[in-house]
């Protein structure tokens, strides 16, 4: 067996863009690949050990969280200076656990080893020297042979044969301990291209927006990514890819600052001060107590809260640990504003039986020296329901408007009219505002947005007592404006523009403001009615920031510049605005929104 000789004269090394995040991260602790110093070599025996001196000393690498953040921001700044709009693509509908490196690997979708037809004497290519050394070592152990020739791997670009005219190729290879001789030309799979930078967009509190930006080395590669990567699965979600429509790049950390939101309301009581009183005053006795494992949307619960986790546990570790209990659809680690773990996480199963098994198996389980707390997640996002569906802990009988299920009477509390009580639309409860009066989407969480005879989101009215249910309002006439409800409290005007410009041209977008804080809803105006219809069809019930959005055409035309239509912000043409005075706020009679 003759070994393929490496012809240095016929070798052309691939250019590495100097603002590729992979190249710039060599001085960061995240990097794992050594820097190749001198002439490339495919064998450890031929490697000059003096090349190690060119590497950055490990002691000089940033180790603290702040140092790594500064290094990451510096890399983003350098990439922004050389970024080209026609090379960038926007990737939407990402899972909230996707990080920039996962996104980059997905959009690149190429393995480190690129194999060509060796019958004409061409040499296979590895992405870097480290991969080449590993492959050559594996080749010696496994005896990778093709047509009587021993495969030899080298870094850089090799001319000759089928590899001469391709930039990024890969071959589907069966996993085996020994490759048989090739009797036919290997099948070549083209990838989208070379990714030079990727970033997942985040909210001010550090959580993912579910979208990101990826930049390729050439416009042709970006267009190829749009054609080939759209509707592909990434961590259980079909992503969509389009060109980036922003003239200015958005690389770098999102602007910080505390998320907007109000204080916590009480646990019931007729004046919202919190009470465990009789049914007429709300509180926990406003309705029947919640069952031990009550769910949302009337279905069995599937999402678990995992507490007392070690702070170094990643979402991959969490998913691997709980995988034995059943099919996991999502696993997340709760992160603080500083990017560090809070020591807790969320695991969602596809089946409620699997969730019950996980509680039985892992509650009290010792993991890395800690006893885990495993229970049902009480704050799991509820799926959209029909206008009269019960989505709380149980049916809402007539009782306190606070508490876990009252219909009317008290104020505030953990639900009642909206929240954990009547769910998404009981006639006597809250929900999506199909009731006579009361704060929609949760009395306990400060009302939410848009009630019938109450404040247009955020506050509940003082009236209490039985009343007849109003019929659901007819759908609004199509227009260029849409009304978006159940937004995260930290959502800004710019976030609205970024979210909805994926479906069409956005002329204006504003968050509804009341009392100096967000009401959890907003108005978006498109250039055409068709764009507005597309946005409703695409983003209604879309989970954004952990909340399912409720979108419809705006019933009353909003003039922008007044806090997102604070005068016209009510989403029902028959709902008058109810102003909450400062005195009411001081007395505690008017519950204020709480950050969800």
From Swiss-Prot:
Induction: Increased in the filamentous form induced by acid pH. Increased during thermal and cold stress. The keyword Disulfide bond does not apply. It is found in: Nucleus. Keywords: Nucleus, Repeat, RNA-binding. GO terms for biological process: nuclear mRNA surveillance; poly(A)+ mRNA export from nucleus. InterPro entries: Nucleotide-bd_a/b_plait_sf (IPR012677), RBD_domain_sf (IPR035979), RRM_dom (IPR000504), RRT5_SRSF_SR (IPR050374). GO terms for cellular component: cytoplasm; nucleus; ribonucleoprotein complex. Residues 1-11 have a biased composition (Polar residues). Its main location: nucleus. Pfam families: RRM_1. Residues 182-246, 302-379, 480-556 form the RRM domain. Signal peptide: none annotated. GO terms for molecular function: mRNA binding; RNA binding. It comes from the Eukaryota. Residues 1-83, 244-279, 458-478, 563-596 are annotated as: Disordered. Residues 259-275, 563-572 have a biased composition (Gly residues). The keyword Transmembrane helix does not apply. Disruption phenotype: Cells appear vacuolated with a cell separation defect. Leads to abnormal mating. Cells accumulate melanin and hydrogen peroxide, leading to activation of oxidative stress responses. Sensitive to hydrogen peroxide and boron. Decreases cell population growth. Decreases virulence in Z.mays. Residues 12-23, 42-66 have a biased composition (Basic and acidic residues). Binds to intron-containing transcripts and is involved in quality control for the export of spliced mRNAs from the nucleus. Binds to pre-mRNAs until splicing is completed or until faulty mRNAs are degraded. This is Serine/arginine (SR)-type shuttling mRNA binding protein.
């Amino acid at each position: 067996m003759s070994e393929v000789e490496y012809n240095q004269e016929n070798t052309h090394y691939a250019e590495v863009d100097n603002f590729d995040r992979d190249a710039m991260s060599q001085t960061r602790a995240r990097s794992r690949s050594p820097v190749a110093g001198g002439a490339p070599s495919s064998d450890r025996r031929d490697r000059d050990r003096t090349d190690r001196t060119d590497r950055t000393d490990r002691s000089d690498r940033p180790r603290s969280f702040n140092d790594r953040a500064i290094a990451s921001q510096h890399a983003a700044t350098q990439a922004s200076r050389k970024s080209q709009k026609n090379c960038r693509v926007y990737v939407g509908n990402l899972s909230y656990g996707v990080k920039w490196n996962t996104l980059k690997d997905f959009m690149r979708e190429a393995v480190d080893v690129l194999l060509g037809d060796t019958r004409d004497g061409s040499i296979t290519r590895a992405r870097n020297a480290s991969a080449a050394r590993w492959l050559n070592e594996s080749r010696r152990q496994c005896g990778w042979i093709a047509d009587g020739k021993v495969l030899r791997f080298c870094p850089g670009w090799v001319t000759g044969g089928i590899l001469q005219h391709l930039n990024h190729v890969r071959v589907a290879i069966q996993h085996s301990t020994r490759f048989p001789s090739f009797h036919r030309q290997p099948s070549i799979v083209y990838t989208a291209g070379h990714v030079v930078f990727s970033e997942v967009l985040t909210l001010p509190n550090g959580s993912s927006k579910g979208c990101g930006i990826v930049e390729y080395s050439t416009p042709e590669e970006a267009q190829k990514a749009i054609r080939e990567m759209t509707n592909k699965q990434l961590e259980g979600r079909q992503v969509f890819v389009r060109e980036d429509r922003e003239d200015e790049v958005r690389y770098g950390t999102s602007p910080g600052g505390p998320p907007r939101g109000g204080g916590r309301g009480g646990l019931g009581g007729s004046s919202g001060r919190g009470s465990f009183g009789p049914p007429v005053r709300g509180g926990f006795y406003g309705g029947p107590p919640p069952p031990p494992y009550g769910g949302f949307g009337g279905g069995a619960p599937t999402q678990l809260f995992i507490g007392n986790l070690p702070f170094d546990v990643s979402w991959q570790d969490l998913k691997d640990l709980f995988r034995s209990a059943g099919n996991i659809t999502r696993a997340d680690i709760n992160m603080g504003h500083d990017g560090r773990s809070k020591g807790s996480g969320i695991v969602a199963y596809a089946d409620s039986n699997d969730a019950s098994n996980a509680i039985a198996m892992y509650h009290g389980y010792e993991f890395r020296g800690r006893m885990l707390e495993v229970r049902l997640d009480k704050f799991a996002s509820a799926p959209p329901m029909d206008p009269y569906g019960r989505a709380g802990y149980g049916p809402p009988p007539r009782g306190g408007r606070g508490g876990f299920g009252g219909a009317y009477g008290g104020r505030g509390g953990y639900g009642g009219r909206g929240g954990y009580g009547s769910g998404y639309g009981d006639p006597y409860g809250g929900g999506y505002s199909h009731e006579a009066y009361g704060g929609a989407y949760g009395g306990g969480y400060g009302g939410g947005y848009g009630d019938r005879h109450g404040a247009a989101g955020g506050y509940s009215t003082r009236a209490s007592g039985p009343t007849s249910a109003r019929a659901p309002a007819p759908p609004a006439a199509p227009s260029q404006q849409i009304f978006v409800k159940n937004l995260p409290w930290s959502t800004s005007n710019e976030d609205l523009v970024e979210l909805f410009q994926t479906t069409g041209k956005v002329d204006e977008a504003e968050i509804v403001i009341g009392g100096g804080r967000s009401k959890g809803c907003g108005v978006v105006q498109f250039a055409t009615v068709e764009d507005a219809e597309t946005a409703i069809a695409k983003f209604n019930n879309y989970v954004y920031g952990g909340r399912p959005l409720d979108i419809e055409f705006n019933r009353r035309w909003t003039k922008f510049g007044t806090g997102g239509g604070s005068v016209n912000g009510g989403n029902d043409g028959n709902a008058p605005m109810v102003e909450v005075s400062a005195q009411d706020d001081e007395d505690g009679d008017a519950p204020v929104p709480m950050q969800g």
